[in-house]
Design a protein with these regions (language model features):
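A general marker of short, structured functional hotspots
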Residues: 37, 58-61, 118, 145
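N-terminal domain-onset segments
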Residues: 1-57, 190
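Sequence-level detector for tyrosine residue identity
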Residues: 41, 60-65, 122, 149
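Domain-scale macromolecular recognition modules
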Residues: 52-106
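Mixed-charge (acidic/basic) macromolecular-recognition segments
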Residues: 3-25, 107-192
Length: 192
């Protein structure tokens, strides 16, 4: 293989990566408080830590499940599964145009349920990450190298979105708390 041919193959790969990164660049940004950014980070990181092998697009809704202790994002809604649902339904997730995720938890996510307990354990881990990082910049700089390709691309978009939104509001400190699960669940019930 000649050097030219080798570079051509690398360029094609690079073009695809650049296209994916461009597609994951945030749009429709607004300023966010540090608490809003923490909430967006927590729920977005939950979705991005889930297993999925498909390309997601802003504006579409996906279903989140807890399958044998692992988060799994699916194109298939619970009512479409019938008796073959892979695990406990957690809620609906929507990728916003600013590359953050919104999560609407299912009403079955009640206190002391396995899903509730798994979410509390997840939030404990996120709380430790936020406190250990000391700043948004340090937190967002830590790439999720263990994630599959699509999730890494989306994590890059999330980091860019939060950086820009925090810069618009003049915020840079990491909040000492993470969103309370009970608070999030009760806010959703009030909205319904």
């Amino acid at each position: 293989m000649t050097a030219h041919a080798k570079n051509t193959f690398q360029d094609k790969g690079l073009v695809l990566v650049l296209q994916d990164l461009h597609a994951a660049s945030p749009g429709q940004l607004r300023s966010k408080s540090s608490d809003e950014a923490a909430r967006d980070y927590c729920w977005s990181a939950l979705v991005l830590s889930s297993a999925f092998g498909f390309r997601v697009s802003p504006g579409y809704t996906y279903s989140l499940y807890l399958v044998e202790g692992q988060w799994q994002l699916s194109l298939i809604a619970p009512e479409e599964w019938g008796a073959r649902m892979p695990g406990a339904f957690v809620g609906q997730c929507k990728l916003r145009h600013d590359m953050t995720w919104s999560v609407v938890f299912d009403e079955s996510v009640a206190e002391d349920s396995p899903v509730h307990d798994a979410l509390l354990q997840y939030l404990d881990g996120i709380h430790e990450q936020l406190q250990a990082s000391g700043s948004w910049e340090a937190l967002l700089r830590n790439g999720e190298r263990h994630l599959p390709y699509q999730q890494r691309v989306l994590t890059t978009g999330l980091a860019s979105s939060l950086r820009q939104s925090l810069a618009l509001s003049g915020q840079s400190g990491v909040p000492l708390s993470v969103p309370l699960l009970q608070e999030t669940l009760s806010l959703q019930q009030q909205a319904n």
